[in-house]
A protein has these predicted regions:
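Extracellular/periplasmic catalytic domains that process cell-envelope and extracellular macromolecules
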Residues: 1, 25-28, 87-92, 115, ...
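Flexible, low-complexity junctional segments that flank or bridge functional domains
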Residues: 1-32, 36-62, 76, 80, ...
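Active-site-proximal beta-strand/loop segments in catalytic clefts of secreted hydrolases
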Residues: 6-10, 35-38, 64-67, 98-102, ...
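Soluble non-cytosolic domains of exported or imported proteins
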Residues: 9-17, 41-48, 89, 101-108, ...
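Gly/Ser/Thr-rich loop/hinge elements
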Residues: 41-94, 132-138, 149, 153, ...
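Extracytoplasmic/peripheral linker and loop segments enriched in polar/acidic and small residues
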Residues: 85-86, 167-208
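Extended C-terminal subregions enriched in glycine
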Residues: 94-116, 120-128
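C-terminal soluble interaction/assembly domains
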Residues: 115, 122-139, 145-147, 153, ...
């Protein structure tokens, strides 16, 4: 009745056909649990590709600021970032994204965008942050330096660098840990099965060759 996906690294490539097949596999489910706990980040392109499958329309996802001088606060005015829905199979049933303090970088951005969607609930713990675009260089002494060069703001122009709070905070209990039970997944399942109004995924947007499979 409930679909479950764990995505542990946004550096791992995600193909469009893989996403099509995933949503078809879960088409009879009441909702999906999308688990990104302990995901340290990776490629923003993968984050966007997945997020597009949950959109109904083009949305403002946030803002980015670029360095324009040597001063501490010499940044450009916030530049808006937008994301459009995929032209393939999209999912509009309930989704619960599981997070914890080990969600960084592209994962932080993924959560920042997904929480804007009305059918998505963020559950677990605050993310780790670190959402700015990274810059890497080498000092004359041979040391490598990596830092966030372009601050990213959310759709309300608030900094996300220090993490994003969940819609519903859930922590692992000692009792469940001793039993090998995942408190957060159990809470997500209970929420999805609680009887929310559901909508069907748009099968018309999937390619004919995938439907034939």
């Amino acid at each position: 009745q409930v679909g479950y996906v764990y995505y542990g690294n946004f550096s791992s490539g995600v193909g469009e056909s893989n996403l099509d097949n995933m949503f078809l596999h879960f088409k009879d489910c009441k909702g999906i649990i999308f688990d990104v706990r302990n995901n340290g980040g990776g490629a923003m392109s993968n984050s966007d590709r997945i997020t597009q499958r949950f959109l109904e329309e083009k949305i403002l996802t946030g803002y980015v600021m670029y360095k324009k001088g040597n001063g501490h606060n010499d940044f450009s005015t916030p530049y808006p970032l937008y994301l459009s829905p995929s032209d393939r199979l999209c999912w509009q049933k309930p989704v619960i994204v599981l997070t914890n303090r080990h969600c960084y970088s592209a994962t932080n951005n993924f959560v920042s965008t997904m929480r804007l969607l009305p059918h998505v609930t963020i559950m677990g713990d605050r993310t780790g942050g670190g959402s700015g675009f990274p810059f890497t260089t080498e000092l004359p002494i041979g040391w490598s330096v990596r830092f966030s060069a372009c601050p990213i703001l959310d759709a309300d122009k608030k900094h996300t660098e220090f993490g994003i709070d969940p819609d519903q905070e859930v922590a692992m209990t000692k009792e469940d840990m001793q039993k090998g039970k995942d408190t957060i997944i159990e809470a997500a399942i209970s929420r999805l099965l609680s009887g929310s109004e559901l909508s069907e995924p748009d099968i018309n947007k999937i390619s004919p060759e995938i439907l034939a499979d």
